[in-house]
Amino acid sequence: MSTPSALGSFLHAFFEDHLVCQKGLQPATIRSYSDAIRLFLLFTAADKRCKLTQLDVSDMTSHRVLRFLDHLEKERGNTVASRNQRLAALRCFFEYLANRLPVMLAEAHRVTGVPVKLAPPPRTRYLERDEVEAVFQHLPKKTPWALRDRTLLLFLYNTGARAQEVADLKVGNLDLGDKPRVRLHGKGDKWRVCPLWKPCAQ
């Protein structure tokens, strides 16, 4: 059907053009897709007992995808969420192949038909208010970074922001006027506004 070099060409175009230029995915999502497909290729090469460079487009089958997903959970100990993320990446790649190689349409149809697994939501663990107050009471007060550390913890407690959202925060995102608030840049290139408590704004 093709040659090993053809698979390499499709992979290069998938990551360099399709995901970036056509789908406009974020770098973190592209890295996740890359990791998923890398693991799938390694699994396929081991299954065929061949080198990665010897893999062919015809080796990309729905049967292997199903076995790969089973391998992720049973042998690699991946969570259901991780398994579903890997499946999303493979669905996207198989759809891409089918759009360029009609002979892959049936395989792509079977892969996109693989259902995601449902998992019970993880139990959310949190601190009660008195526990949070105890944390603040025990923060060092005389270190060079005491004010910074206290402000960061209070900001996180106030907003529920992720660590990366705080790291990406810019002065222009803060409004410390009569109604203090902050604009946070979250996952999926989405923005949200969060009010700030007066102690936090001060």
Language model feature labels by segment:
Residues 1-202:
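Conserved catalytic core of the tyrosine transesterase superfamily
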